[in-house]
Each structure stands twice: as C-alpha cells, then as structure tokens.
C-alpha cells in the first residue's frame, strides 16, 4: 500500500485529537522550562544596562551590518551579548530536547496501550535525552548554517535530518547512523517529507508574526505563548514523522 500525505495527515490529526491534553501540557511545560532557563541564565539587570547605556551610539551603525555592529562594541558589551545568546540557545535546546523525547515516548506508550501523561512521557524519555541533546544540537547548527548561506540549503538539511530523532528513539541507534538513515529515507520519500517540513517552517514564522502583534504587555507571558505555540507545531510534526517512519519500516 503506497504511503500518501493524506493518510499521514489523517493519522496525525487523529492521534493529536485523542491525545490533545497531553500534547498541550507538554508544549506548555517545555515552554515554561525554556523561558525559566533563559531568564535564569541571562545577564543581570546591571549587565544589560551596559548594552542599553550605549544603544544610541550603536543604533546609528545598524545599517553597516551585524558584524560591524559587534566589532564596534566594547569588550564588556560583547561579553554581555555572548551571554544573552548562549542563554537563549541553551534554553531553547533543552526545551526542544524535552519536547522531542516526551512526544516520541508519548506516541510509543500510547501505541503500547499504556495510560500516560506529559510528565510520565518526559520521564520515560530520560535514557535518550543525552543522545537527543547532541543530535538536536548538531542538527540545529547544520540547519542554521544552511539558512545563513542560503535559505534552500537550510531547508534541504532540515528535510534530510527530519527523521533522525525518531530513529534515535525507536531504534536506539547512534547519532551519525540515525542521520545517515534519515537522509536516505527522507529523500527517498520526498513527497511525504518535504511538504511537512516546509509547512512546519512557515507555521513557525506565521506564529512569530502573529504573536508579536498580540496586545500582551508582559515579555514573560509573550515568550511562554510564543514558545508554547511553536512547541505545539513541532509536536504535530513529530507525530507525523513518527507515523511516516513506522510505515516505512513496516
């Protein structure tokens, strides 16, 4: 029986509807963790004042480019900027790892007929979290590098790497073995993988644009809403990719 996008979409929506509460709770929980980690690791108010105190001087050179802007900063400002970037990157990475492991284990537990919850699914994913951490870090670096060069290489890399988290969890395979298998399967079934990845990327951009227009005065609440909706989209994509891999393996 051929694998069609309509079949995968229907199966994905059925699972999402049946497990909506657990998926929503997991999306919000990992969003809270991301925001809290980012807040805890970010520079203090005094350190941020170093950047804001000279914002008027730096704003005049924004048009010259990002690298020129960074070069014109003082060493103290560069250090604060690096800490901000590192905090945001690490917090997002931890949130993505917990979400990925939790969603994939939720699918497996439900498929085995076990009653589960968001917390139990995340806890059950503990043996895979370290491997997922390195995998997602590597995938993120590769995709962002591709996006910086040109958009198309980044999208192609996202497609190639899309099945690797599923393979790591279901097959308990190594990182590079999962990437190799994912690349082969993703491009062999491009009609099923490419539309899903492109829609996922577009949905994330749309969420960013829409949420930024909402009348929410609290930056923390805005961050939780943005991360929560983004996590929900990623969770649905993971369900789609898990179902696709199960059909391909069968």
From Swiss-Prot:
Transmembrane segments: 20-40, 90-110, 132-152, 156-176, 192-212, 222-242
One Pfam family hit: UPF0259
Protein's membrane topology: Multi-pass membrane protein
Keywords of the record: Cell inner membrane, Cell membrane, Membrane, Transmembrane, Transmembrane helix
Primary residence: membrane
Organism field: Pectobacterium atrosepticum (strain SCRI 1043 / ATCC BAA-672)
GO CC, one annotated term: plasma membrane
Family assignment from sequence similarity: Belongs to the UPF0259 family.
Protein name, entry field: UPF0259 membrane protein ECA2305
Keyword Cell membrane: yes
Disulfide bonds: none
Location of this chain's protein in the cell: Cell inner membrane
InterPro entries: UPF0259 (IPR009627)
């Amino acid at each position: 029986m051929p694998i069609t996008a309509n079949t995968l979409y229907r199966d994905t929506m059925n699972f999402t509807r049946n497990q909506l509460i657990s998926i929503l709770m997991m999306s919000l929980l990992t969003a809270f963790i991301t925001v809290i980690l980012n807040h805890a690791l970010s520079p203090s108010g005094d350190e941020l004042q170093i950047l804001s105190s000279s914002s008027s001087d730096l704003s005049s050179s924004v048009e010259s480019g990002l690298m020129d802007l960074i070069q014109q900063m003082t060493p103290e400002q560069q250090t604060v900027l690096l800490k901000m970037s590192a905090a945001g990157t690490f917090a997002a990475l931890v949130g993505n790892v917990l979400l990925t492991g939790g969603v994939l284990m939720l699918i497996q537990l439900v498929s085995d007929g076990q009653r589960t919850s968001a917390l139990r699914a995340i806890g059950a994913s503990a043996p895979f979290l370290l491997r997922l951490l390195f995998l997602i870090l590597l995938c993120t670096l590769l995709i962002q590098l591709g996006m910086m060069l040109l958009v198309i290489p980044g999208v192609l890399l996202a497609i190639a790497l899309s099945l690797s988290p599923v393979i790591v969890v279901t097959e308990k395979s190594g990182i590079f073995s999962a990437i190799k298998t994912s690349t082969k399967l993703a491009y062999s079934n491009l009609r099923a993988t490419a539309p899903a990845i492109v829609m996922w990327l577009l949905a994330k951009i749309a969420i960013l644009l829409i949420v930024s227009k909402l009348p929410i005065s609290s930056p923390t609440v805005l961050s939780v809403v943005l991360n929560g909706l983004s996590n929900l989209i990623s969770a649905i994509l993971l369900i789609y990719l898990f179902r696709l891999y199960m059909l391909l393996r069968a």
